[in-house]
């Protein structure tokens, strides 16, 4: 995942400039901090929190501007101006996603945003590379885990059930869509 995060995030910071307005960013399920380190290298004013299981963060390398916190995202999520969920929601059932999203909602200030990066399944049969990737990932997630890939409408439903006021799709980067769930408008 480290190599995937490096390639993905280097492209993401070129096309998604909303990180510039943040003073703090929490990467939930951030592994060893690769994605957050790339963001903070471009935006050094951001106070980064890399949040993952205790056994993951205890062995993470030290990056400037990143604090590591171990915990369980289904119990509580650290507070921040924004929260990043990259390739996380597709691992879990709708029920677990709603629990996680509610925890993220509680950790955000008014007008805070959750930045979600995940595949979006097409509604109609498509043969383009984006659709093939999403469908292939859906088969893998369904077979190996309790998760699944979701359509735009399914993501919007999860956001609404967790309390978010607004859902929008921002851009596409290497197989993943950048989405924002806004706490209040």
Please place each PLM-identified region on the residue numbering:
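C-terminal alpha-helical "lid/dimerization" subdomain adjacent to the S-adenosyl-L-methionine
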Residues: 117-162
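Repeat-unit-sized solenoid/scaffold elements
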Residues: 7, 153, 182-185
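Short polybasic/polar patches that bind polyanions
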Residues: 62, 160, 165
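Core SAM-dependent methyltransferase catalytic element
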Residues: 163-185
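Short, flexible active-site loop motifs that bind/organize anionic cofactors or intermediates
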Residues: 87, 145, 168
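Conserved adenosyl
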Residues: 1-117, 121-128, 176-177
């Amino acid at each position: 995942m480290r190599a995937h995060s490096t390639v993905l995030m280097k492209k993401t910071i070129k096309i998604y400039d909303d990180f510039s307005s943040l003073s703090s960013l929490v990467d939930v399920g951030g592994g060893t901090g690769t994605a957050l380190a790339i963001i903070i290298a471009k935006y050094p004013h951001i106070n980064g929190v890399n949040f993952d299981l205790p056994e993951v963060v205890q062995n993470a390398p030290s990056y400037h501007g990143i604090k590591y916190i171990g915990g369980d995202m289904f119990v509580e999520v650290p507070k921040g101006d924004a929260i990043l969920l990259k390739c996380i929601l597709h691992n879990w059932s709708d029920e677990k996603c709603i629990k996680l999203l509610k925890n993220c909602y509680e950790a955000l200030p008014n007008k805070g945003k959750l930045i979600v990066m995940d595949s979006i399944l097409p509604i109609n049969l498509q043969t383009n590379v984006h659709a093939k990737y999403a469908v292939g990932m859906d088969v893998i997630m369904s077979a190996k885990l309790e998760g699944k890939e979701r359509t735009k409408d399914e993501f919007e439903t999860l956001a609404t059930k967790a309390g978010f006021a607004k859902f929008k799709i921002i851009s596409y980067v290497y197989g993943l869509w950048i989405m924002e769930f806004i706490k209040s408008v």
